[in-house]
Curated annotation (Swiss-Prot):
Gene that encodes it: Crebl2
Biased composition (Polar residues): 114-123
Subcellular location(s) per record: Nucleus
The protein, known as: cAMP-responsive element-binding protein-like 2
Renumbered residue ranges of the record's region Leucine-zipper: 62-69
Region annotation Basic motif: where it falls in the sequence: 29-60
Gene3D superfamilies in the record: 1.20.5.170
Post-translational modification: Phosphorylated by AMPK.
UniProt keyword Iron-sulfur present: no
PANTHER family: CAMP-RESPONSIVE ELEMENT-BINDING PROTEIN-LIKE 2
Region of interest: Disordered: 1-24, 93-123
Length: 123
């Protein structure tokens, strides 16, 4: 008769089928697991370093924006009192100078146009 056993609907035959791990395989598996754990910890450490640097840079940006906001608040308070802060005055005078330079470059020079119109009129 057949020496096979029925377990959970499957027929199992006696004997050594498949691969049984040897002690060497267990040691190798344990070493691979340890190496994988070391690599995982290293990746985790790098990820946390990156995140900490990101947080610190964002905190610096927030501080700079808060200082800028405070400066603008002070400018607004000064203008409410009828004073024009020197920084705004410098910005305004700088814009006026830029506009005057742009206006002078847009209009052609008078000497060239007069010469051209005179030569046309003379013909």
């Amino acid at each position: 008769m057949d020496d096979s056993k029925v377990v959970g609907g499957k027929v199992k035959k006696p004997g050594k089928r498949g691969r049984k791990p040897a002690k060497i395989d267990l040691k190798a598996k344990l070493e691979r697991s340890r190496q994988s754990a070391r690599e995982c910890r290293a990746r985790k450490k790098l990820r946390y370093q990156y995140l900490e640097e990101l947080v610190s840079s964002r905190e610096r940006a927030i501080c700079a924006l808060r200082e800028e906001l405070e400066m603008y608040k002070q400018w607004c308070m000064a203008m409410d009192q009828g004073k024009i802060p020197s920084e705004i005055r410098a910005l305004l005078t700088g814009e006026e100078q830029n506009k005057s330079q742009q206006n002078s470059s847009r209009h052609p020079k008078a000497g060239k146009t007069d010469a051209n119109t005179n030569s046309l009129v003379g013909n």
